[in-house]
Amino acid sequence: MKLIKYPDRSQWNEILKRPVLETENLFDTVRNIINRVRAGGDRVVMEYEAVFDKAELTSLAVTSAEIEEAEKEVPIELKAAIYLAKRNIETFHSAQRFEGKKVDTMEGVTCWQKAVAIEKVGLYIPGGTAPLFSTVLMLAIPAKIAGCKEIVLCTPPDKNGKVHPAILFAARLAGVSKIFKAGGVQAIAAMAYGTESIPKVYKIFGPGNQYVTAAKQLVSLRDVAIDMPAGPSEVEVLADESANPVFVAADLLSQAEHGVDSQAMLVTTSEKLQTEVVYEVERQLGYLTRRDIAEKSLASSKLILVKDMEEALELTNAYAPEHLIIETKDYMEVAGQIVNAGSVFLGAFSPESAGDYASGTNHTLPTNGYAKAYSGVSLDSFIRKITFQEILPSGMSAIGPAIEVMAANEHLDAHKNAVTVRLEEIRK
């Protein structure tokens, strides 16, 4: 961990810099895989599964028998936890339903919007070092609430060709339509272009490593939409002298164990807290099963001491963290001044873990500073809003002359004429 005390503003850009990956060769590799899947379909996807996931497959689809068998393998306490999380996620996302209303912008001119679900969506759930069944809930539940007709899920199998039981249980519970054994770039390509088994979708959601991220970026250039750009997961804890160092250390470690490239940062006005957190992190590390991963992540973590809360807020908004935990005595007042963050956790008893799993908010969030321009996944991510307008003769009489003037000044004669012929008809 790097202890930084009272950094000058000229140092902020360097301090807040995220790791940058060399992507030129990566994109070439990813593009080649995408092109091969696009041309070869299921056969090529299964070839890549054998190479990357060491799984020899004869088909990609997960069968109903496999899902039923998986349900028997999920412990009762985990099922209960997943049910609780599902209820809270449904409650929060159901409250986001769009209720469009008709607006009369002038007499005879009525405008409105209608929310329509994206018909086919693809969800990518990574394999790696942990089964992310929670991400299944975070993506499939709002898709189902939105009314998406087809929810396709791709996730890599283990070397025996099996998908983790908790992922299958969560997928069935959340309303996923079809599940396929496919991971990495090949899964993204399959959902973007379709194969004999895997349907083409209109939008792809879900996290992944740098190869998956690159694949999503490439297919989104012209062929399919994606949720958002993604990078390594990150947390910032913003704290003053009232914060509990045990809690702060636990929050930093909960982020660090995600992966070796995860970002964990403390910004505090208390030198005493900064010192105590260092001790607590070292103490709690000993209890972690993923200690090696957390230690590598913490090597690049930063504990930053600033002179006052005003400076802490400026630094935080400049960083735009994916997750922001505010542990200050006046956390609501501090939160009111946050303008750049993916998801904010308020007070000593609101850890990031709550949002990751079961509070109800979505954990699919903008990373890498994208919180300055992007929102996290919500119900809106799975819908489109179609605009309607109805113009009566009285409305055309009211706005028509202005349209004619504007069109003429943009030298768009046909635009002007489309109004002129109608005005002439009205005046007859």
Curated annotation (Swiss-Prot):
Cellular component per GO, a single term: cytosol
Ligand binding (NAD(+)): Y124, Q186, N209
Cofactor: Zn(2+)
UniProt EC number: 1.1.1.23
Domain of life (superkingdom): Bacteria
Molecular function terms, GO-annotated: histidinol dehydrogenase activity; NAD binding; zinc ion binding
Cofactor binding note of this UniProt entry: Binds 1 zinc ion per subunit.
Entry binding sites for substrate: S233, Q255, H258, H323, D356, E410, H415
Active-site residues from the entry: E322 (proton acceptor), H323 (proton acceptor)
Main enzyme class: oxidoreductase
Database matches in NCBIfam families: hisD (TIGR00069)
Name of the protein in its database record: Histidinol dehydrogenase
